Amino acid sequence: MRFMTGKIRTYIILALLLLCQNIMAQNKTPTTDSPSQSDLGIFALPPFERAVRCIKYYEGWHDIKRNYPYIGWGHRILPHEKFKKNLTYLKADSLLRSDLTKLCAMFRRYGKDSLLLAVLAYNVGPYKILGNSKFPKSHLLEKIERGLRNIEKDYLDFCRWRDKCIPSIRRRRMTELQLLYIP
């Protein structure tokens, strides 16, 4: 294997990955005795439940010791809240749903986009979208207020951290759009 160049090794690995992907896809073909593909998956869930699952997937679990002031699936601990070191999944789920419900109420006036905006605000904070003394109102919100529906680019612009586009955040935004955007 020493005589193989990096380029050849890369091609071999890609070929093996494509072969494995093909085999996996063949194993997932529906049969007559199994439920149809449309009956399965996240799109069968109500939009709010899709939003909760998406947040849980991308936020991951926050331990109070390592991630203070965040806990559970990204709940920010407020000054009046006291939590024990071992937060249960049930309590964390309740906190996430409560936070998301509050954000939905905050964006209620935006109608069918309120859940999408709430999920974005859960990650970046509501004032990066709504604007305040530190941040101007986002272009995304301005477009929604004008009734424009081509908001994909503006939504995907929220994938920056320290002025760099972060691929993992971009994937998250694309997933959120696919799950929650209503054209």
Task: Please identify what each model-predicted range represents.
Residues H62-N67, F107-L116:
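Surface-exposed patches in mature extracellular/periplasmic domains of secreted proteins
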Residues M1-I12:
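Bacterial N-terminal signal peptides that target proteins for export
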Residues S114-K128:
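Short N-proximal segments of mature Sec-exported proteins
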Residues N67-I71, H75:
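Early exported N-terminus immediately downstream of N-terminal targeting peptides
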Residues Q26-H62, H75-H80, N86-M106, K128-P183:
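Long, amphipathic alpha-helical surface segments
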Residues Y11-Q21:
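Bacterial N-terminal signal peptides
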